[in-house]
Regions:
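Short linear interaction motifs
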Residues: 90-108, 189-193
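Glycine-rich phosphate-binding loop and adjoining helix at the ATP-binding site
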Residues: 3, 11-14, 29-81, 135-154, ...
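Active-site rim beta-loop-alpha module in soluble metabolic enzymes
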Residues: 335-348
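Structural motif
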Residues: 21-27
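Active-site phosphate/ATP/adenylate-binding loop shared across adenylate-forming ligases
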Residues: 115-119, 124-131, 138-161
Length: 348
């Protein structure tokens, strides 16, 4: 069980297309154990039928499909274990990377969208100043189609653009207040955005949109699909693996709200939390503490994890630390429901 859990944690963290296990020639026990991996991790089982250790391969295989790679496999090799060598550590300077990112954003018209499990928070930035903020309540775990996820995100970007385009007049300020007020209906926000266009012309096109999403994001594509937030869609979709990949279109849709040459970048919310902390520290008297990167946990609807490496970049790996097996010995805690704070189970 310890062996399986270690492999499960490695796959949940790093993903990949292949795991090579090297065993000593003649080690019958190790060979027999490795021969159980395909069955234990359910490589030949359909995604919607996998359980236990097999669930980690759902995310890994979706990533591989999105990247045009083959499904995950185990490869067992009988040979002498290679001697591990460590390359000389290169000098790093993540601090410069974090400071450069801020300097590049000065003067730009930007929209940041923080998608969470209970709300979406949106901010509009112009010339380095916050000019519009919006909070939108939602419950993605109860949604039954990808369109229900995509449409509010697109609407939030449109609303922020409209708010950023308004002149500083009493009439415009009233319209802006109504549009950004928490709890206003989707129809009312659409109507307000239409009014902005009718009275003041087409809203500005953004220089960039940044989105953090509570799932695995690789190369600006949402590719996980096993979190609590998409539970309702998994339960109601007749073919979830055709429905879920439609989220990958979100970047293309958001680009329509940017100027020519504008950019949309998407990342996991835990990664963006770590990046935000790193940038803030890089501009403080404690800048040296982030020279080699940052690792951070976030507490929201679920446990999030973010890692910024020593170059100041977000590694393109699943990093599903919330999914890792952390306590094999606590058998009494296994009896509790995953939503019980005493449980060591996750809902997968």
């Amino acid at each position: 069980e310890y062996f399986y859990a270690r492999l499960y944690n490695l796959i949940s963290t790093f993903g990949g297309t292949r795991m090579v296990l090297t065993i000593a020639p003649g080690d019958a026990t190790a060979k027999a154990l490795c021969e159980t991996l395909d069955e234990t991790f359910q490589l030949s089982v359909k995604k919607n039928l996998r359980s236990g250790y097999g669930k980690c391969l759902n995310v890994t295989d979706r990533i591989n499909t999105a990247m045009g790679a083959n499904p995950f496999v185990f490869q067992v090799v009988e040979a002498g274990c290679p001697v591990e060598t460590s390359a000389p550590q290169k000098a790093t300077d993540a601090v410069s990377s974090f400071k450069s990112a801020v300097n590049k954003a000065r003067g730009a018209a930007l929209c940041g969208i923080d998608i969470g499990g209970t709300d979406i928070k949106v901010v509009g930035i112009q010339g380095g100043h916050v000019v519009a903020v919006k909070e939108y309540d939602w419950n993605p775990a109860e949604m039954t189609s990808i369109d229900q996820v995509i449409e509010p995100v697109l609407l939030m970007a449109r609303v922020i653009r409209s708010a950023m385009s308004l002149p500083q007049t009493a009439e415009a300020e009233q319209l802006k207040t109504e549009m950004l007020k928490k709890g206003v209906s989707d129809d009312a926000m659409r109507s307000a955005a239409d009014t902005v266009s009718a009275l003041y012309g087409k809203p500005l096109l953004l220089d960039g949109i940044g989105v953090c999403f509570p799932d695995v994001v690789i190369d600006d594509m949402i590719v996980g699909g096993e979190t609590l937030k998409t539970r309702g869609i998994r339960a109601h979709s007749p073919d979830y693996d055709k429905e879920f990949p439609r989220l990958a279109e979100l970047k293309r849709m958001l680009l329509k709200q940017c100027r020519a040459g504008g950019v949309v970048h998407m990342s996991n919310d835990g990664s963006l939390a770590a990046y935000t902390a790193a940038v803030e520290l890089a501009h403080s008297e404690h800048a040296e503490t982030v020279r080699d990167g940052v690792f951070a946990h976030t507490l929201g609807t679920e446990l999030g994890t973010g890692w910024i490496d020593e170059t100041g970049e977000i590694p393109q790996i699943p990093l599903e630390v919330y999914n890792c097996v952390i306590d094999l010995g606590n058998y009494p805690a296994r009896a509790f429901d995953p939503m019980d704070v005493r449980s060591v189970n996750n809902f997968n």
